[in-house]
From Swiss-Prot:
GO CC, one annotated term: cytosol
Protein name according to UniProt: Phosphopentomutase
Subcellular location as annotated: Cytoplasm
Annotated metabolic or biological route of this protein: Carbohydrate degradation; 2-deoxy-D-ribose 1-phosphate degradation; D-glyceraldehyde 3-phosphate and acetaldehyde from 2-deoxy-alpha-D-ribose 1-phosphate: step 1/2
Cofactor(s) needed: Mn(2+)
Metal-binding keyword on record: yes
Name of a matching Pfam family: Metalloenzyme
Gene3D superfamilies named among the record's database cross-references: Alkaline Phosphatase, subunit A, Phosphopentomutase
Key words of the record: Cytoplasm, Isomerase, Manganese, Metal-binding
UniProt keyword annotation of Acetylation present: no
GO biological process, alphabetically ordered: 2-deoxyribose 1-phosphate catabolic process; 5-phosphoribose 1-diphosphate biosynthetic process; metabolic compound salvage; nucleotide metabolic process
HAMAP family listed in its UniProt record: Phosphopentomut
Gene label: deoB
Binding of Mn(2+) 2, residues: D286, H291, H339
Length: 396
């Protein structure tokens, strides 16, 4: 049996939501609309996303509705109880997460801090949400003098530990993070990722090094990626995908520096011969602009992505399918710095398909994973539906 598509390239525009989800009120996110609010006042068009049909999913500034879209289009709502990156990605690959990860807008509880201190023999300082560069500027010199651990968080369910490489050697920092990872698997903490954040330099001139290391949780069940790998298909993770799934179901992992490097890496992968999926996360939308409520930077990043689409399309093969989607929202005009509970856009196109139309909406991101699993004839997730039939493609 031949598969409809030999290769599927899945691109997650991290946090690029397309309007408040049906249960947004339960998350205090009424009125959120990342794409609309980001593009309001933006002076440039997004011709390639427009041509694919992004503006057909919902009315958007600078992205018009088109009569003949270049992709199948719809929007999906999230079933899982959470609006973080890991929950969104895990659901995309077929899981339904009913126990949300915890976030710590007021810092970590005293009980956890005490456990970390007694386990490591080092004092914890900072203990609040902050940007990594800001917290190192503030506490870096103190850390060098005392050997304390700079512990901080963000709007995501993460615990980050920063230390100067000359004060706490990398091996020790990694060992500390591994211990904290085990500690925080306890349901009362349930933190998604522990991140080692080493830095170097002198007071007033500290820089974070590339020796960052993430300690994630394994997904709470088998994903479509596991099924693909077990069936001999390639699963090429680009960007932070490998970290999000803790390596589960991944056959090759490629690191990226930023969105544009992510697109460069994807295009290089597309040029190779393989059978299976490539899976790219473009994190800058979320990390650099959404959390920082930088509307202008966010809009420009979407424009930069739009400009790369023709290059990607030029390298596609006849039996390739491209899927462009998101994992949650992060409305740059929303209060605070947290993600927003939103629909995600879904655009799917292939050189072998000439006529496109709207697809039915679904109430789970898992329909992306189900469609991929159906294409490769591997085990289907319990949640979601395959869009292959609606797309007019089937197994031969």
């Amino acid at each position: 049996m031949t598969t409809p598509f030999k290769r599927i390239h899945l691109i997650v525009m991290d946090s690029v939501g397309i309007g408040e989800g049906p249960d947004a009120a339960a998350f205090n996110d009424e009125g959120s609309h990342t794409l609309k609010h980001t593009l309001e006042g933006f002076k440039q068009k997004l011709p390639h996303l427009e041509q694919l049909g992004l503006g057909n999913i919902a009315p958007l500034p600078v992205v018009s509705k088109v009569t003949h879209p270049g992709a199948f289009y719809t929007k999906l709502s999230e079933a899982s109880v959470g609006k973080d990156t890991m929950t969104g990605h895990w659901e995309i690959m077929g899981l339904n997460i009913m126990q949300p990860f915890k976030v710590y807008p007021n810092g970590f509880p005293a009980e956890l801090v005490k456990e970390i201190e007694s386990m490591t023999g080092r004092k914890v300082v900072a203990n609040r949400p902050a940007s990594g560069t800001q917290i190192i500027d503030e506490w870096g010199e103190h850390q060098m003098k005392t050997g304390d651990l700079i512990v901080y968080t963000s709007a995501d369910p993460v615990l980050q530990i920063a230390a100067h490489e000359d004060v706490i050697p990398l091996e020790e920092l990694y060992e500390i993070c591994e211990k904290v990872r085990e500690l925080t698997k306890d349901p009362k903490y349930l933190i998604g990722r522990i991140i080692a954040r080493p830095y170097v330099g002198e007071p007033g001139n500290f820089t974070r090094t590339s020796n960052r290391h993430d300690y994630a949780l394994k997904p709470f069940g088998r994903t479509v990626m596991n099924s693909l790998k077990d069936s001999g298909y390639d699963v090429i993770a680009i960007g932070k995908i490998n970290d999000i799934y803790d390596g589960e179901g991944v056959t090759e992992a490629i690191r990226t520096k930023n969105n544009m490097d992510g697109m460069d890496q994807l295009i290089e992968v597309v040029k190779k011969d393989f059978e299976g999926i490539s899976f790219l996360n473009l994190v800058d939308f979320d990390a650099l602009y959404g959390h920082r409520r930088d509307k202008e930077g966010y809009a420009q990043a979407i424009k930069d992505f739009d400009l790369r689409l023709p290059e990607l399309m030029n390298h596609l093969r006849e039996d390739d399918l491209v899927i462009i989607t998101a994992d949650h929202g992060n409305d740059p005009i929303a209060k605070g710095t947290d993600h927003t509970r939103e629909y995600i856009p879904l655009l799917m196109f292939s050189p072998k398909i000439k006529d496109y139309h709207e697809l039915s909406q679904d109430t789970t991101f898992s329909s992306i994973g189900v469609t991929i699993a159906d294409n490769f004839n591997v085990e289907l997730p319990k949640y979601g539906k395959s869009y292959l039939k609606e797309m007019g493609v089937e197994h031969q």
